[in-house]
């Protein structure tokens, strides 16, 4: 009977050791489960957040057809937007008159391909669509319209030598279209826009080509009028008070102020004034809307003096 207590004590120690060991294992399993649960919850939150808040690139290609009238003719422009490659392709004309304009916002280049010329012209462009802020000052429509030059006229002159190394267009859509034709760099050149001639004097009107294709083929014709304008500009430096005018108000003719306010003619002007504004083509392209295709079109009109219209009706001009 005296040997039983030691044996019982050894059995108790063994049981206590096994219990402590099992408790440690359970505690470790609980800690591992908690860590894995936190990691799984974090991954779920990150996946959900990236799906809902991260801008997903659309794999869809957008096509659009735009119809407009130019010089009385109905024309169409086909636009294709590929968000994956960040390119825009504009197609206009048919046959030899077809023109393709590719805007590569990923690499920062623009390619213009003329099917009739079998040539491709490359120029650099921005890689990010600019954000246009609203104008700070509002234009009062009732104010008198003065001579306004909206912007300096720019022509794109091609380089004399073609592009030999085309590695910079390796991953561009431009190279797919212009791979088998000659490619040239084109650079902007400013043209000094002349002041309008006094319509009381004799003068010739200057006609500039309206299409980019004609401007490329007729670069010399674009430069000649600029030289002529600079030579004759010194003859128009007289002030408004020194210009001759046929004032028919002395004969009892009164002009309605609404003619001036609505832009039909200018009552107090002594020369024709040009008013220009930019019109954007609503092609539903990238933001901001409307999308300005080729920077928009500049539409100008000339506001003549009211006395000039009277003189014209009397046959004096």
Curated annotation (Swiss-Prot):
Organ and tissue specificity: Widely expressed with highest expression in tendons and ligaments, in the diaphragm, eye and skeletal muscle. Expressed in neuronal cells of all brain regions. Very low expression, if any, in glial cells.
Membrane topology field: Single-pass type II membrane protein
Organism: Mus musculus
GO cellular component, one term: membrane
Family under the similarity heading: Belongs to the chondromodulin-1 family.
Protein name: Tenomodulin
Keyword Disulfide bond: yes
GO-annotated biological processes: endothelial cell morphogenesis; negative regulation of angiogenesis; negative regulation of endothelial cell proliferation
Key word Transmembrane helix present: yes
Extracellular side: 51-317
